[in-house]
């Protein structure tokens, strides 16, 4: 159950980051103003996902050592890189992919230890 909560915290955090990206996509040229920004569905989705992710994360910390749990959030870097590359068409250079591979190795090692 704890691993499922950890995965949920990761996914909610990633969804929050993706929603933030969508929220600011239209703000590249000029900021629309606070009231217009607050009407963004994407911004509210980001706040909801990040808030819920925080609550789930607190439950994870009750049940798992922080030295194991926190590095597992490294999966967020992997997921966000994939979304950036394939959804937002952002370039990812070979060094970045190497870093992602190293993160995956580290998460795998810690997962075996837990």
Swiss-Prot record:
Belongs to the ArnE family. Pathway: Bacterial outer membrane biogenesis; lipopolysaccharide biosynthesis. GO terms for cellular component: plasma membrane. Its main location: membrane. This is Probable 4-amino-4-deoxy-L-arabinose-phosphoundecaprenol flippase subunit ArnE. It comes from Pseudomonas savastanoi pv. phaseolicola (strain 1448A / Race 6). Pfam families: EamA. GO terms for biological process: lipid A biosynthetic process; lipopolysaccharide biosynthetic process. The keyword Cell membrane applies.
